[in-house]
Amino acid sequence: YEYESNKIKIYYSSMATPLLTYDYKLKDQKKRIIKKQQIPTGHNEKNYNLKRVYAISHDGEKIPISIIKRKNTPKNAPTLLYGYGSYGISISPSFSVSRLSLIDRGMVYAIAHIRGGMEKGKKWYENGKKKNKLNSFKDFITCAEFLKKENISKNITIHGGSAGGLLIGASLNISPDTFHCAVAEVPF
């Protein structure tokens, strides 16, 4: 039976690291890579900088932002800021091959881990839904303003789909001058 196994599988990726699958032997405490996601165009994770920064929202809450860019990307580069913040769904800062083209052309990619998701637990989720939904929108706007203030970006494109599309529409209505461009996929 599986519960008698002497090894486990570990899956790992980051915004710069394609998915790695390890076998980890419990008794020996040793791991080995058994599978690595292949990128047909080639990929060197050492060419990228990853950062986790925190923006302070309207009520003092620290909002995490995950950022990836090429090491040679200048300050104030165009940025694509993604957000969701609904249904307790955490947006993992994992690898996506579809982002590489933008990042390799000098854009910054950022994920705003706003309230409504579960990134910081159940209270984080509860403080971004129903009567507290405005927190999600304010958190997202705060993240964009933080990226500008820290000279990470001047021009920010925002992106979200479904409930994230609602986030994009609300953020544009609340603070239209904060954003350069917006993509609201299937908003409701």
Residue ranges and their predicted role:
Residues 4-17:
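Short beta-strand elements that form the blades of beta-propeller/WD-repeat-like
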Residues 11, 83, 185:
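Conserved residues at the C-terminal ends of beta-strands
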Residues 26-30, 35-162, 167-170, 174:
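Cap/lid segment of the alpha/beta-hydrolase catalytic domain
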Residues 16-24:
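Structural motif
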Residues 177-187:
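A conserved short beta-strand
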